[in-house]
Swiss-Prot record:
A GO-annotated cellular component: ribosome
GO BP: any one term: translation
UniProt organism field: Oenococcus oeni (strain ATCC BAA-331 / PSU-1)
Gene that encodes the chain: rpmJ
Residue ranges that the Swiss-Prot or TrEMBL entry lists as coiled coil: none
Pfam families, per database record: Ribosomal_L36
Entry keywords, A to Z: Ribonucleoprotein, Ribosomal protein
Name by which UniProt lists this protein: Large ribosomal subunit protein bL36
Family the UniProt entry places it in: Belongs to the bacterial ribosomal protein bL36 family.
Keyword Ribosomal protein listed: yes
Length: 39
């Protein structure tokens, strides 16, 4: 999982969600696209 200051969907399968107050991107097609917003 990548931790980035700004998270963006990388493909059509990417979903932007909010978990425990953190913005995350999950992707069923490519797990490399997983991201979490952080410092």
């Amino acid at each position: 999982m990548k931790v980035r200051p700004s998270v963006k969907p990388m493909c059509d399968q990417c979903r932007v969600i909010k978990r425990n107050g953190r913005v995350m991107v999950i992707c069923s097609a490519n797990p490399k696209h997983k991201q979490r917003q952080g410092k």
